[in-house]
């Protein structure tokens, strides 16, 4: 149903999909279109998106390009990294964590301009449609959502290219003259999907990567980097205090220089199918390794293990789009409550694709040399271990005795 919409706010990147959607909304809904482009540190000039929107008939006052980099890292990336979050054991959720912020700002703009609908460019096969729309409905329950991929007949990238050519919409080309990979980029990562990557057996072309050198071509000498944490969040790199966005930018530079953070993954989408994606997350990988190293000497054992138990659930909530859900907020409160003592400095060694913790120190350290030393000590009576072991072995002994009796 295409009637009843007077003004719609479109999440607009200036790329193929959303440029076609912009024109399609104008033709199909005959409504006023407001474009919103989020600067999340994707590393590209955003003014062309403004120019393209104007070329397609959008009035200047209806074009919003917002710098959200600091908010993105401070309020979304850092809280997620406090949990050491990994989806299916490997994915650092670079795409997933950006969607709640985009949804939030899109709804704010809709309220500001009096729009009665919002629209996005996510396909009907992927996770992003769910992530965007769960955010919309959580923040504005009565909003109308337009999802063109679920309405139109343009059911392939070839069809989109034909539509763009017909309407003289300029589309970016890669260096071989073909339509580029489907990508998503922000300060945390860049992802690649489509084209040859749809065959999970095919190795990605090296010229696809933009944020990291090939590990085998990384410097032949290791580099050490120190990351300082305060209450679980990074605040400085090599002694220099930086804003959240600047800090992640610097970690991206360091990690990318040493070929760190590449991931080739087949993941389970929320909608039920498997998909293959290739990711570059250099700074996020350094941050993940360092934060875990910081927790290793500052967190109580059972608090750490509890975090490890809830982390997969927390990661699944973010991956599936439930950032604004009460259960995610409850888990966040638990996670944040563990971070007050996660303070100190972690030293990493970067070398040809690897990042290893080689040093850590904290004013809140629970590591006690006088207790763990292999040398003589006066604080720990090793005889105490005997009773501890026997008590923990009691159920095992009783179980075996019962089995022996038949």
UniProtKB/Swiss-Prot annotation:
Pathway(s): Amino-acid biosynthesis; L-arginine biosynthesis; L-arginine from L-ornithine and carbamoyl phosphate: step 2/3
GO biological process, one term: urea cycle
Keywords: Amino-acid biosynthesis, Arginine biosynthesis, ATP-binding, Cytoplasm, Ligase, Nucleotide-binding
Binding site for L-citrulline: 91, 96, 127, 131, 182, 191, 267, 279
The keyword ATP-binding appears for this protein: yes
CDD domains named among the record's database cross-references: ASS (cd01999)
Binding sites annotated in the UniProt record for L-aspartate: 123, 127-128
EC number in record: 6.3.4.5
GO cellular component terms, semicolon-separated: cytoplasm
Keyword Amino-acid biosynthesis recorded: yes
Reaction catalysed by this enzyme: L-citrulline + L-aspartate + ATP = 2-(N(omega)-L-arginino)succinate + AMP + diphosphate + H(+)
InterPro entries: Arginosuc_syn_C, Arginosuc_syn_N, Arginosuc_synth, Arginosuc_synth_CS, Arginosuc_synth_type_1_subfam, AS_cat/multimer_dom_body, Rossmann-like_a/b/a_fold
Molecular functions (GO terms): argininosuccinate synthase activity; ATP binding
Residues that, per the record, bind ATP: 11-19, 38, 121
Cellular location(s): Cytoplasm
The family this protein is said to belong to: Belongs to the argininosuccinate synthase family. Type 1 subfamily.
Complex and partners: Homotetramer.
Protein name listed in UniProt: Argininosuccinate synthase
Gene this chain is encoded by: argG
């Amino acid at each position: 149903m295409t009637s009843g919409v007077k003004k719609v706010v479109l999440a607009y990147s200036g790329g193929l999909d959303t440029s076609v959607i912009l024109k399609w909304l104008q033709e199909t809904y005959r409504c006023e279109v407001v474009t919103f482009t989020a600067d999340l540190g994707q590393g590209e000039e955003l003014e062309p998106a403004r120019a393209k929107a104007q070329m397609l008939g959008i009035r200047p006052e209806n074009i919003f390009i917002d710098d959200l980099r600091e908010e993105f890292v401070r309020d979304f990336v850092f809280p997620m990294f406090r949990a050491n979050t990994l989806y299916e054991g490997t994915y650092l959720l670079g795409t997933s964590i950006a969607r709640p912020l985009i949804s939030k700002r899109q709804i704010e703009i809709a309220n500001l301009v009096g729009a009665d609908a919002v629209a996005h460019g996510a396909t009907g096969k992927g996770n992003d449609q769910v992530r965007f729309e769960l955010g919309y409905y959580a923040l504005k329950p009565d909003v109308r959502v337009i999802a063109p991929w679920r309405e139109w007949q343009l059911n392939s990238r070839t069809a989109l290219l034909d539509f763009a050519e017909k309407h003289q919409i300029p589309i970016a080309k890669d260096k071989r003259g073909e339509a580029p990979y489907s990508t998503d980029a922000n300060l945390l990562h860049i992802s690649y999907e489509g084209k040859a990557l749809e065959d999970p057996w095919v190795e990605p072309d090296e010229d696809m990567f933009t944020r990291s050198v090939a590990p085998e071509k990384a410097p032949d000498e290791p580099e050490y980097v120190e990351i300082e944490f305060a209450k679980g969040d990074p605040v400085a790199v090599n002694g220099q205090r930086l804003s959240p966005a600047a800090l992640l930018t610097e970690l991206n530079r360091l990690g990318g220089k040493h070929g760190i953070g590449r991931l080739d993954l087949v993941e389970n989408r929320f909608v039920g199918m498997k998909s293959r994606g290739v990711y570059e997350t250099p700074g996020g990988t350094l941050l993940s390794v360092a934060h875990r190293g910081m927790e290793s000497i500052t967190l109580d054992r059972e608090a750490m293990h509890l975090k490890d138990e809830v982390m997969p659930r927390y990661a699944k909530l973010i991956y599936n789009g439930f950032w604004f859900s009460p259960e995610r907020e409850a888990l966040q409160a638990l996670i944040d409550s563990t971070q007050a003592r996660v303070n100190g400095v972690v030293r990493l060694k970067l070398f040809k694709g690897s990042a290893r913790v080689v040093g850590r120190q904290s004013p809140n350290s629970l590591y006690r040399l006088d207790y763990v030393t292999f040398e003589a000590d006066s604080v720990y009576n090793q005889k105490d271990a005997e009773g501890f072991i026997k008590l923990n072995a009691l159920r095992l002994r009783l179980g075996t005795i019962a089995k022996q009796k038949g």
